[in-house]
Amino acid sequence: IGANDTVVGISASGSARFVIEALQEAKDRNAATVAVVNASNSPLAAEADVSIEVITGPEVISGSTRMKAGTAQKLVLNMLSTASMIKMGKVYGNLMVDLKATNRKLRARARRIFCAVTGENETEAERFLDLAEGDTKLAILMAVSGYDRQAAQSALDGCNGFLGKALQAIHKERECE
């Protein structure tokens, strides 16, 4: 854990000592810190750089934080992970394109994503996924651009792994021809 990381601490009460200590250790290592709590003005929230306080009120069964508090925390974590995936270039539109097709289930998902983005059929999806060694973003870029694997990888690297930016660059390049 270091300056390029973010540590998220989760506690319904916001007073779990080990979570507070984990955030303190993360701060000592120059990591950003986030608290997800279900209580106002908690010690954990005070420790974090960013505090997300999701006030859910008392549980239906007292002390059973897996119900309202846990459900609310799960929703917040889903939002944080989704936003992170978008910011990291793993998403194109509403599709999780940063997918390595390493088994049958993922291969089928990669084919569907490829077809949705390119408009090509599943046979072409298989062909390009084979050429890209299962890398969905690379397969899409190869199909759309006509680039070989190395040129497509270079184009993707030049756009920091963002498929959308790489596709825009290709379209812009072709407009100028």
Please place each PLM-identified region on the residue numbering.
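Glycine-rich phosphate-binding loops that contact phosphosugars or nucleotide phosphates
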Residues: 1-75, 84-88
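Short, amphipathic alpha-helical interaction segments embedded in low-complexity terminal/linker regions
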Residues: 79, 84-177
